[in-house]
């Protein structure tokens, strides 16, 4: 049976599209509000951090719940919560809008571990154990949401301001109801194939390999979240209109989607560790070129290539993280996704301080260096 013909999987990936469509409007909203509210880059990073923490700290809890009650209520409830808080945020005045954007992260926290659990569970049933491919399809729809968000949201913001984003809400309600109808209510606690062990490894080797994996995951998330959060602000500071920097942000997310799908497909066929290492090493090149070429016509290909290379290893890292905790699909999904979201936002806060003090060129160079470091560290992991 084709995975895409599975009603539960279809509802899950459509839900991911809607959740990340709303999530990805946040950087555009913050860029628009930065002038009337006087938001610094540090404060923008702090809002993004608080939004992520409000969700990431809860993801293991929601994952634990998914293992016991199934994904249906968590996925559907997460979508509808996101829609409600987003709708209130775009019509609320002043700092209340920021508070509502932060609280909306709870809906994302409920959705992501349950959705990722359902995606990989569907792969074990319908895609001959190709979990990385299934995870990449799940994350592909999320990336499509990130692509559509600036492409649609930029013109809406330019024409009607933040209230114009209410036009996105009619997409969320039917998808939330569809998830409530079609998703499984079966508990998610079940054995997962563990990460491939190495015969008789020393404790020190295992500890270093695990720490290397943690650092690689944090670096990948930091690099990608930096670009998602600050690319609109970078071009806004250069004087570009919302419609233009929305298109540039969408170009980055198109690259991320293409890279993520390609990396996931390759991850079921060749060495996953090599994909992670090579993609991050290569990502340092376009990121390092941003200070010289970002404000030219080369900004579009740089956005696409940097998105593709930073996103190529994402589903591989998530699936490997799930396998480190076999037996609890929901809890393991919540832990690894919560960690990636939190690590990315903490890094983004640091980069916001750096941008305020030294400018965005310094942020791009630092992000490039982090990717190179992550690519080298990946060689020490046991991702296979």
Segments predicted by a language model, with ranges:
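Helix-loop-helix hairpin linking two adjacent transmembrane segments in secondary transporters
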Residues: 94, 137-184
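Extracytoplasmic gate region of multi-pass secondary transporters
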Residues: 26-27, 208-250, 257
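Conserved MFS/SLC helix-loop-helix module at the cytosolic interface between two early adjacent transmembrane helices
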Residues: 57-94, 270
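C-terminal transmembrane helical hairpin of 12-TM major facilitator-type secondary transporters
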Residues: 270-317
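Cytoplasmic helix-loop-helix junction between adjacent transmembrane helices
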Residues: 100-140
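Structural signature of the two symmetry-related core transmembrane helices
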Residues: 73-87, 274-289, 368
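Helix-to-loop junctions at the C-terminal end of transmembrane segments
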Residues: 58-70, 157, 259-271, 355-356
């Amino acid at each position: 049976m084709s995975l895409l013909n599975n009603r539960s999987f279809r509802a899950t990936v459509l839900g991911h599209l809607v959740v990340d469509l709303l999530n990805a409007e946040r950087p555009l909203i913050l860029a628009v509000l930065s002038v009337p509210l006087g938001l610094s880059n540090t404060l923008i990073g702090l809002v993004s951090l608080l939004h992520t923490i409000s969700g990431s700290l809860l993801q293991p809890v929601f994952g634990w719940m998914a293992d016991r009650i199934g994904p249906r209520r968590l996925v559907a409830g997460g979508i509808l919560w996101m829609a409600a808080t987003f709708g209130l945020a775009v019509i609320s005045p002043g700092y209340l809008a920021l508070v509502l954007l932060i609280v909306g992260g709870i809906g994302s926290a409920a959705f992501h571990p349950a959705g990722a659990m359902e995606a990989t569970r569907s792969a074990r049933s319908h895609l001959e154990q190709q979990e990385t491919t299934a995870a990449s399809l799940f994350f592909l729809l999320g990336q499509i949401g990130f692509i559509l968000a600036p492409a649609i949201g930029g013109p809406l913001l330019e024409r009607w301001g933040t209230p114009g984003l209410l036009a996105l809400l009619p997409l969320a309600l039917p998808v939330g109801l569809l998830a409530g109808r079609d998703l499984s209510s079966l508990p998610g606690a079940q054995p997962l194939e563990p990460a491939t062990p190495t015969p008789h490894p020393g404790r020190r080797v295992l500890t270093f390999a695990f720490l290397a994996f943690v650092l690689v995951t944090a670096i990948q998330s930091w690099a990608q979240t930096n670009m998602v959060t600050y690319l609109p602000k970078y071009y806004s500071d250069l004087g570009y209109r919302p419609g233009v920097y929305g298109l540039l942000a969408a170009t980055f997310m198109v690259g991320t989607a293409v890279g993520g799908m390609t990396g996931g497909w390759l991850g079921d066929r060749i060495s996953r560790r090599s994909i992670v290492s090579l993609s991050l090493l290569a990502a340092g090149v376009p990121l390092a070129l941003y200070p010289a070429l970002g404000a030219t016509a080369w900004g579009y290909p740089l956005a696409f290539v940097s998105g593709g290379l930073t996103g190529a290893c994402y589903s591989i890292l998530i699936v490997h993280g799930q396998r480190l905790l076999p037996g609890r699909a929901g809890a393991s999904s919540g832990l690894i996704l919560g960690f990636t979201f939190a690590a990315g936002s903490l890094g983004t806060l640091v980069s916001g301080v750096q941008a305020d003090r030294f400018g965005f060129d310094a942020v791009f160079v630092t992000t490039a260096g982090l990717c190179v470091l992550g690519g080298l560290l990946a060689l020490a992991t046991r991702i296979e």
